[in-house]
């Protein structure tokens, strides 16, 4: 059986990690093989610390994310899919397009060109976008990292970027209101996923 690749996206504080864990538990309870992973750090764990703590140019930041993603795809995601697992990634390429493209202002054609090589063209079957107003996201974040310290206007651009990506690929994106209760969001994710499960 071929695997299934799912991603969760959204601003920090939107509940992605919580929902990724809930989704993994839901699928495991049905006896489905699941691989839960995340970016950054899914391919090169030491890159995560560097990305979240060092002052970097937007270009260097994106290239480091891309190096991590290339290894993540090669070492984790593709083998998981080949083994027939449901691979759930807490962030993937759309995070870079939203944060480094829309947020930091890097040109989207260049980002996509680098991404094509790093991901080997691999796209998720479904991406759950947990949409949250930036004001609420900043209130929810406990210990801001370097990126979270960029301010409200930055996160408004990132949110608009995510929504633009979702509008461009309505067949892949499921936009969910991240202000809803956790349980309600989990049920909505499960409902959208059921038609894809054998």
From Swiss-Prot:
InterPro entries reported in the protein's UniProt record: P-loop_NTPase, Thymidylate_kin-like_dom, Thymidylate_kin_CS, Thymidylate_kinase
Class of the enzyme per the UniProt entry, highest EC level: transferase
EC number of this enzyme: 2.7.4.9
Membrane-crossing segments per the record: none
4Fe-4S is among the record's keywords: no
Tree of life domain: Bacteria
Keyword terms of this UniProt record: ATP-binding, Kinase, Nucleotide biosynthesis, Nucleotide-binding, Transferase
MF terms in GO: ATP binding; dTMP kinase activity
Any one cellular-component term (Gene Ontology): cytosol
GO biological process: dTDP biosynthetic process; dTTP biosynthetic process; dUDP biosynthetic process
Binding positions for ATP per the UniProt entry: 10-17
Keyword Metal-binding tagged: no
Annotated signal sequence range: none
Catalysed reactions listed for this entry: dTMP + ATP = dTDP + ADP
Known role: Phosphorylation of dTMP to form dTDP in both de novo and salvage pathways of dTTP synthesis.
Record family assignment: Belongs to the thymidylate kinase family.
Name of protein: Thymidylate kinase
Species assigned in the record: Thermus thermophilus (strain ATCC 27634 / DSM 579 / HB8)
Gene: tmk
């Amino acid at each position: 059986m071929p695997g299934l690749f799912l991603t969760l996206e959204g601003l920090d504080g939107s509940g992605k990690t919580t929902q990724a864990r809930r989704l993994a538990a839901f699928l495991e309870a049905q006896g489905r093989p699941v691989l839960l992973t995340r970016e950054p750090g899914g391919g090169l764990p030491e890159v995560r610390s560097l990305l979240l703590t060092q002052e970097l140019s937007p270009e260097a930041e994106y290239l480091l994310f891309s190096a991590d993603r290339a290894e993540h795809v090669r070492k984790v995601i593709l083998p998981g899919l080949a083994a027939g697992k449901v691979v759930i990634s807490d962030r993937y390429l759309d995070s870079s397009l939203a944060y480094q493209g829309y947020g930091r202002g890097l040109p989207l054609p260049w980002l996509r060109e680098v991404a094509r090589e790093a991901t080997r063209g691999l796209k998720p079957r479904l991406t759950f976008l947990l949409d949250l107003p930036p004001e609420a996201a900043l209130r929810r974040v406990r210990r801001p990292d370097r990126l979270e310290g960029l301010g409200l206007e930055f996160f408004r651009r990132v949110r608009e970027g995510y929504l633009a990506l979702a509008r461009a690929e309505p067949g892949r994106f499921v936009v969910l209101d991240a202000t809803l209760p956790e349980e309600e969001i989990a049920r909505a994710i499960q409902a959208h996923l059921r038609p894809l499960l054998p």
